[in-house]
Regions:
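The beta1-alpha1 cofactor-binding region of Rossmann-like NAD(H)/NADP(H)-dependent oxidoreductases
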Residues: 47, 68-80, 112, 228
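Substrate-binding pocket helix/loop in short-chain dehydrogenase/reductase
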Residues: 105-107, 111-116, 214
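Alpha-helical segment proximal to the catalytic Tyr-Lys
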Residues: 135, 179-183, 242
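Residue(s) in the substrate-gating loop at a strand-loop-helix junction
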Residues: 150
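C-terminal substrate-recognition "lid" of short-chain dehydrogenase/reductases
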Residues: 127, 222-251, 256
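Active-site helix of classical SDR
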Residues: 130, 166, 174
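Conserved glycine-rich cofactor-binding loop
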Residues: 15, 22-23
């Protein structure tokens, strides 16, 4: 080979934005991208939360900054792209990690507004953000979109029905992005995490029965950590995954095998 494979993982000169990056999976992915050379913009609804993350990343030698955006507000989703470009001159990598799930229980107990909120944050926001970014990415020779879905999008969870529906939609959206934008050099892939130890999923892993069942079913019998997803996200964001688009990558310890 005429190229060192390590060079394909190098993200130096790339600009990345990670939504839902104030903690958990988003924060871990932002750190991973930064450690491989990317300039990282961390975003969430509350500016002070991601400012703290950006400060920690900068203290580690990573080029990072913070921007606030509510992914359930389409104007804010689009404005986030504009702000990143204004600040850094371009955008190459998008990680759509922001998500919401305000209900835990049967679909019958959820009203229309709850479903609309879930779909807005988990599906429509990522779409509008990416649509805004396409011309920017195209002008820079392409880019990479990594959508954080869920194994619930592949095998719906009974008590997380509407959330599972939204993640199924995000997986399908990822494939449409890959088909429509591949000719412009823009790749799109989805990561489907299993049970990860984050604040977002604490209602599950703090439930002794749920945790015991998950650990018994998974070949890798431990709960996942946010850092377990960072390497996969870096791979998909980098040229090491240059031939990967429309893919659905499961990281669940083998739970769904």
């Amino acid at each position: 080979m005429d190229e060192n494979i390590k060079q394909r993982f190098d993200l130096t000169g790339k600009v990345a934005v990670v939504t839902g990056a104030s903690k958990g999976i988003g924060e871990a992915i932002a750190r991973g991208l930064g450690e491989f050379g990317a300039t990282v913009v961390v975003s969430s609804r509350r500016l002070e939360a991601v400012e703290s993350v950006a400060e920690q990343l900068c203290a580690s030698g990573i080029q990072a900054s913070a921007l606030a955006a509510h992914m359930g507000d389409m104007e804010q989703a689009r404005a986030l792209v504009d702000a990143v470009v204004a600040r850094h001159g371009g955008l190459d990598i998008i990680v759509n990690n922001a998500a919401t799930n305000p209900v835990f229980g049967p679909m019958m107990n959820a009203d229309e507004s709850v479903f609309q909120k879930i779909m807005a944050v988990n599906v429509q926001g990522p779409l509008e953000l990416c649509k805004r970014a396409v011309p920017v990415m195209r002008s820079r020779g392409g880019g990479s979109i990594v959508n954080i879905a869920s194994v619930g999008g592949l095998n719906p969870e009974r008590m997380l029905g509407l959330y599972s529906v939204s993640k199924s939609a995000l997986i399908s959206l990822t494939k449409v992005m890959a088909k429509e934008w591949g000719g412009m050099g823009i790749r799109a892939n989805a990561i489907c995490p299993g049970l990860i130890k984050t604040k977002f999923s604490q209602a599950l892993w703090q439930n002794e029965q749920v945790l015991k069942q998950a650990l018994a079913m998974a070949p890798i019998s431990r709960i996942g950590m946010p850092q377990d997803l960072a390497g996969l996200a870096v791979f998909l964001a980098s040229d090491a995954a240059a031939y990967c688009t429309g893919g659905v990558f499961v990281a669940d310890g083998g739970l769904t095998v």
